[in-house]
Amino acid sequence: MIIKKAFKEDLETAAYLFDLYRQFYDKRSDIESAKDFLSERMENHESEIFLAFSADDDLKNKGMGFVQLYPSFTSVGMKRIWILNDLFVHENFRKQGVAEALIARSKDLAIETNAKGIILETHFSNTAAQKLYDKIGFEKDDEHFYYYLKV
C-alpha cells in the first residue's frame, strides 16, 4: 500500500473517493462539486489530504481511501492541532489496514508540524470506527461537551 499526499494531479481520484464518502452519509452524488471543493482546499492550503493506493500493479491507479485533515490551534496549549474531519475507505478495500495506514500518516503529519495532537468526532452509532480509534490510541474526551450552532 502506498500513502501519498494529494496534489492537483490527484484531484480526480480524491474527488471520486470524496463523492463516495458523501454518498455514504446519504448525500447525492455530485462529482463536479466534489472536485471544486477539494480543489479549493488544495489551492488555499486549507487542508491536508492523503490518499491510499494499492501497490498491486493491476490496481496501482485505483484509490483505496482518503483522509482529510484541517488545521486548527489550541490557544491554551499554544500549539497546532489537526482535525481529522474525513476518513473513508472504498468498500472493496475495507478490513485491509487502509484506515490504519491513513491515520498513521495523519499522526506523522501531526509530529512533522509539532502539533499537540489530532481530534476527531464520530457518530454514536459508528461503532466500527470507534473500535478502530480505540485500538489506535485515540481517547474519548470526557472533560468537554461539544455544541453546534446552525446558521
Located regions from the model:
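Conserved GNAT-fold acetyl-CoA-binding loop/helix
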Residues: 18-40
